[in-house]
Amino acid sequence: MTSLPDRGVSSSSSDPLCEGNIAPCSSSSEQKEDCSLKQSKTSILSCVFNSPFNIFEAHQDSSANKSPKSSSGSYDWSRVLRRIVCSGSMWRFLGTSKVLTSSDVWFLGKCYKLSSEESSSDSDSESGHATFLEDFSSRIWITYRRGFDAISDSKYTSDVNWGCMVRSSQMLVAQALIFHHLGRSWRRPLEKPYNPEYIGILHMFGDSEACAFSIHNLLQAGNSYGLAAGSWVGPYAMCRAWQTLVRTNREQHEVVDGNESFPMALYVVSGDEDGERGGAPVVCIDVAAQLCCDFNKGQSTWSPILLLVPLVLGLDKINPRYIPLLKETFTFPQSLGILGGKPGTSTYIAGVQDDRALYLDPHEVQMAVDIAADNIEADTSSYHCSTVRDLALDLIDPSLAIGFYCRDKDDFDDFCSRATELVDKANGAPLFTVVQSVQPSKQMYNQDDVLGISGDGNINVEDLDASGETGEEEWQIL
């Protein structure tokens, strides 16, 4: 797929401004003077922008090639810039030319207060840019890779330009596993050795058939839904591929060692209460309970559950009526974010601020790495990113999928309560609804045949209305 414009600085690449790398100067006196001025400006920028997180764009200072009238002018400029940046009233995200205000950020169920009046005296408050960025940079970042073993019988040893949806989905599922094993408050440690569970999670997303949730195994599992090396796929097919892969892994592990590689039930939500096309997807409480029961091998106890809700919120562009509802899902404690992005370009949207979506970008190309499951001294830097990028919510592709993780029955009940309240705010056009039960003849968690959806996730022609079109404000299952 065509990647988003990469205007940011990779977290793994060195920034000459931050590290003080200055090109050598020539011997002429005029050039020495010019170089001295460049060094002065570089030092100023380094001081202003140097932080543990690369949150600023590294632009070449065009004024460095011009001789200022006096050094005091440079000092005044730096003092003003420092005051603006260090005040905390404004900050700049990579991937945009817009300086955002100090509005609250909602990030995977947590609210971060970024106001200029934020105080460090309240250690329990989720406030401050640094606190948010520590959370952001602790999320698992999975990108294009090159140099891995060929996928199946193909010759593909890289997923560059086509694997962004797969990588975005891996990020969402990885967060679910992090939340399950380590908790929502977990942050990436600064020193080794690392937590064995953290390393074990990264190992599962390695790029080989030996890794449970690798791109190799996802493509194999999603073959009947159109997943193939070199081809792009939509959110619905991606969710179904995960459903198949999780089921396959569970069956294999039960035969081999009796252990679960995926420690939760998986519910791909689709359809409506009557199993008909055209309505909002429905979370059925009885279906979720049955999936948990199946996960627990017939026991009635509840289990952790991952919900994936693939949606279409318009035709060529997202219908504006759904944007406030999408934003509110990030306030749910169970939020895992969204698989989405610009049309034809998938990203992992993990937060919102005002009318902007904050995302991790899978389009950076990195070399494939092999992190052994027991290597607690492994270099994990390529799985984390400190570059915050943003996108206007009204530019998001209408085809997307939302994820939620519920740890136990109480957490699931809280999710259902919040989802029901969201329905009440939807003015007749909800993202999805919640019901207790459905007709016995309907199998909502395995209803491709009922819905008339082909294996590749496309809608059959006879499902269109008499005019040959679907309503822009109606829901569809991809």
UniProtKB/Swiss-Prot annotation:
Active-site residues, as the UniProt record annotates them: 164 (nucleophile), 361, 363
GO BP terms in the entry: aggrephagy; autophagosome assembly; mitophagy; piecemeal microautophagy of the nucleus; protein processing; protein transport
Record field: compositional bias (Polar residues): 1-15
GO cellular component assignments: cytoplasm
InterPro entries to which the protein is assigned, alphabetical: Papain-like_cys_pep_sf, Peptidase_C54, Peptidase_C54_cat
GO MF annotations in UniProt: cysteine-type endopeptidase activity; protein-phosphatidylethanolamide deconjugating activity
Catalytic activity: [protein]-C-terminal L-amino acid-glycyl-phosphatidylethanolamide + H2O = [protein]-C-terminal L-amino acid-glycine + a 1,2-diacyl-sn-glycero-3-phosphoethanolamine
Keyword presence, Hydrolase: yes
EC number from the UniProt entry: 3.4.22.-
Disordered as annotated region, ranges: 1-31
Assembly and binders: Interacts with ATG8.
Family per similarity comment: Belongs to the peptidase C54 family.
Function: Cysteine protease that plays a key role in autophagy by mediating both proteolytic activation and delipidation of ATG8 family proteins. The protease activity is required for proteolytic activation of ATG8 family proteins: cleaves the C-terminal amino acid of ATG8 proteins to reveal a C-terminal glycine. Exposure of the glycine at the C-terminus is essential for ATG8 proteins conjugation to phosphatidylethanolamine (PE) and insertion to membranes, which is necessary for autophagy. In addition to the protease activity, also mediates delipidation of PE-conjugated ATG8 proteins.
Name of the protein in question: Cysteine protease ATG4B
UniProt organism field: Oryza sativa subsp. japonica
